[in-house]
Amino acid sequence: MRIFYKTLLFSVLFLIYFSASGQSNRLFVAHYNVENLFDTIDDPKTNDEEFLPEGKNKWTAERYAHKIGRLSQVVRAMNAGAGPDLLGICEIENRQVADELRKSIHQKGRNYILAHFESPDNRGIDVGLLYDSKKFKLLHAQSLTVILPGEKPWPTRDVLLVTGQLKNKTRLHVFVNHWPSRSGGQEKSEINRMAAAKTVRRAIDSLLKVDPTAHILTMGDFNDGPADIAPRQIMGADSLPNGPSPLYNPFLALNSDTTQGSYNYRGSWQFIDHISMSTHTSSSNSKLKYLAGSAKAEKFDFLLEKEGRYAGNPWRTYAGSNYLGGYSDHLPVSVQFELRK
């Protein structure tokens, strides 16, 4: 009997060791549109009036704290409960709200740090990157200004570019995006997303000119599906893992399945949130190897409406000005990589 228990104990320790070892050699990357994460303080420089205690949405300190708690629950649930290594976020009002989200996560073994710059967007919403400093060492961060076409272009969200070093000494460049919306219709507004795509593509081309084997990720809410012109043709995120385009977008393979997606529009799922990567991450000798088939929406059951007309849709915070107390109108998306020596 004693031999049996010793054998059992050894087996358990063996599994724990190799599970932890496997986890340390993986990189879990996600992006999440957190849907209007505003504080309750009026910023006279932005149009944040709807998200004030006396505003249309009656955005109180209690509702704000509830939202922070909801979002941190989502982050903790990712990666089989271990949380992501890198997490892009968008629709954050400012650094303060993003930092409060960071501090509320309380993920054991994690040390999340925030990379963020204020954007010129009229509503004041920005993008940011939360990274675990144990897995990603920050080397450089900058914002890329997107200039929209027209005689009087309105300001839009900047693109965040963060460069860091992974545990295996690989340098990684991460672009976090929140491209202009489809307000006014997809075709009419497409020119604005094309401007954002050109901004990112110029930066990617510059990186690849210096280092043709540069490891690059682009993530975000693109307000376009993977097959649309701006992300696929202009930014250059195509469907071939080792193709001629600078980027590979694994979400293209999921794009035609209307039962999958990060956003539900009139009953049809779409991947307007997606993640692309350098094409060589699929090669056998890459130090950052994409795990084929890992691209997905994080469709946790608790993130979905349970009943009524919108059952199965993302459980959002508001429907119009009607407070629902949910999470977000988007689902997170994620991909995984193997870190090689």
Model-derived regions, located:
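Structured beta-strand-rich core segments of catalytic domains in phosphoester-bond hydrolases
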Residues: 92-171, 175-179
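Extracytoplasmic/secreted cell-surface and envelope-processing proteins
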Residues: 39, 96-99, 123-126, 183-186, ...
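Active-site beta-strand/loop signature of hydrolases that rely on acidic residues for catalysis
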Residues: 29-34, 59, 64-67, 71-98, ...
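Extracellular/periplasmic catalytic domains that process cell-envelope and extracellular macromolecules
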Residues: 23-25, 80-82, 106-108, 120-124, ...
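N-terminal, active-site-proximal structural segment of metallo-dependent hydrolase catalytic domains
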Residues: 20-111, 115-125, 303-311, 315, ...
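Bacterial Sec-dependent N-terminal signal peptides
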Residues: 1-24
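Extracytoplasmic, non-cytosolic globular domains
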Residues: 116, 160, 164-255
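Metal-dependent phosphoester-hydrolase catalytic domains
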Residues: 205-216, 224-341
